[in-house]
């Protein structure tokens, strides 16, 4: 091999190595970041074109995806949205996900590693992937009772099973309706989000988790007060 061909071969080899290295970096190290980028329309359409798993309370859906005729194929809907908003959070086009919708997004979207076999089956059969259902420990009757007891007051109520630690009620007021943030009209979603964000009452703040907003009441204070009397 003469010197010219040898130089060309080396250059071509270096180009292939550079291409292989860059593709490896993208697919292995930055894939999650790119998928999570809000400007990634491919991921956005893919997440809405799949049937997202329901969120259940007492076996009944409080959040589910229903078929639509537009390009997104499914619409996320919330039953008794304001009542369960502190738990479900919201699933939106461009404002991210919160609550269970965010923390268990991998399961609800069907992309969790534990659902790998389901993903392979969907790929081989050509079927649309489907997310897993998530059952909450909330009790609808206790949740409603906590909601009614709080009334128009600002604050939060949490009821916990002392034996298991299961959360039976999770109410925060003022609250919001996640249905207003789950639409497919981007302008309407942004307007609704900005309005909620600008509300001085802070309906987007989950007071059951944000302890700096409302300090928890101490049951022991009742004992001290009784002793003082």
Regions found by a protein language model. Give the residues of each.
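An amphipathic alpha-helix/helix-turn recognition signal
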Residues: 141, 160, 220-223
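Extracytoplasmic/periplasmic proteins that interact with beta-lactams or build/remodel peptidoglycan
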Residues: 1-156, 170-213
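An acidic- and aromatic-residue-enriched active-site/binding cleft used to recognize and process polar
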Residues: 162-163, 172-173, 219
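Active-site SXXK
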Residues: 87, 146, 165, 209, ...
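Surface-exposed patches in mature extracellular/periplasmic domains of secreted proteins
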Residues: 156-162
């Amino acid at each position: 091999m003469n010197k010219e061909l040898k130089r060309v071969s080396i250059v071509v080899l270096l180009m292939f190595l550079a291409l292989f290295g860059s593709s490896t970096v993208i697919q292995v190290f930055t894939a999650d970041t790119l998928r999570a980028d809000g400007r990634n329309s491919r991921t956005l359409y893919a997440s809405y074109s799949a049937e997202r798993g329901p969120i259940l309370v007492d076996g009944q859906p409080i959040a589910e995806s229903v078929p639509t005729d537009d390009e997104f194929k499914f619409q996320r809907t919330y039953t008794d949205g304001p009542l369960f908003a502190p738990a479900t959070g919201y699933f939106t086009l461009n404002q991210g996900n919160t609550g269970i919708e965010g923390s268990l997004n991998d399961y609800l979207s069907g992309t969790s590693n534990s659902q790998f076999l389901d993903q392979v089956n969907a790929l081989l059969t050509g079927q649309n992937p489907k997310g897993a259902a998530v059952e909450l420990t909330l009790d609808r009757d206790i949740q409603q009772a906590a909601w009614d007891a709080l009334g128009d007051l600002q604050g939060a109520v949490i009821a916990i099973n002392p034996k298991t630690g299961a959360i039976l009620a999770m109410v925060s007021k003022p609250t919001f309706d996640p249905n207003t943030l789950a639409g497919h009209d981007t302008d309407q979603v942004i307007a609704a989000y900005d309005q909620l964000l600008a509300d001085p009452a802070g309906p987007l703040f989950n007071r059951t988790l944000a302890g700096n907003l409302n300090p928890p009441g101490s049951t022991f204070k009742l004992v001290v007060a009784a002793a003082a009397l």
